[in-house]
Every structure is written in C-alpha cells, then in structure tokens.
Amino acid sequence: PKRWKLYDSELQYHWEKLIEELHDKDKVRERAAKMFYYWCAFGPLSRGSACCGYAVLFGILLAADCGVPSSLPSERQIDWEAILAPTAAAFVDGVRPWLADSVEAALPDLPPPDEAFSTLRDRLGALL
C-alpha cells in the first residue's frame, strides 16, 4: 500500500541522516526519537509494535554511544505520546529532556565478545 511506501521512505531518510550525524549525540537522539515516532505512528495499535520501537530507540542510542535514559518517564507512555503528537517535531520536543537524561553504558569495561565467548558453544549458550 501507498502508506507503507511513504513510511518506508521516511524511515530510510532518517536512517541515512542518522548515519551522517553520528558524530553529534544530540542529533542522534533526535533522529532516534523521530524513528521511534514514525514507527509508533505507523502501527499504533499493533500488538508489540511499541516494544519493537523501544528496542530500536535504545539500540540506536547504545550503538551510537549516547547512553540510554535511566528509566522510562514516570506516569508517561512515550509510545502513546508519539501516537498522539501532531508532528514528529512536537514529539521530539516533548521527549528531549528525557532522552538527554541518559546513563552512559558501561560497555568499555566489558571484555570483547570474542574473549568472553571464545567457542561456538559459549556463544550459543549466551543466547539462551
């Protein structure tokens, strides 16, 4: 359907801009929030879609070394704010303080994956 193609092109655009702006953590947070907004707006009542959106949001933040918010905002549902926001910009403005209050991941303190899971058995065991 045409709607799917429009969302696909919008998400593709924001993904490409995200890659270009990886050096700027504020812009990464903004792009990640916009991708979350479009994801939630695309399938607002689909079971599990918000969970996937949160996974993408936090995955982008961690991959870009931006850290993640220490917890979800109290008494707020960010997915519903995305669904009900009139525009992506309005949504981003509303969640910007929450995203800025992030905790840096402790990833540098962890051993490299190939050292922590040196055998195929170890790697498969970690997935279970």
Regions found by a protein language model. Give the residues of each.
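Phosphate/pyrophosphate-binding active-site loops
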Residues: 1-128
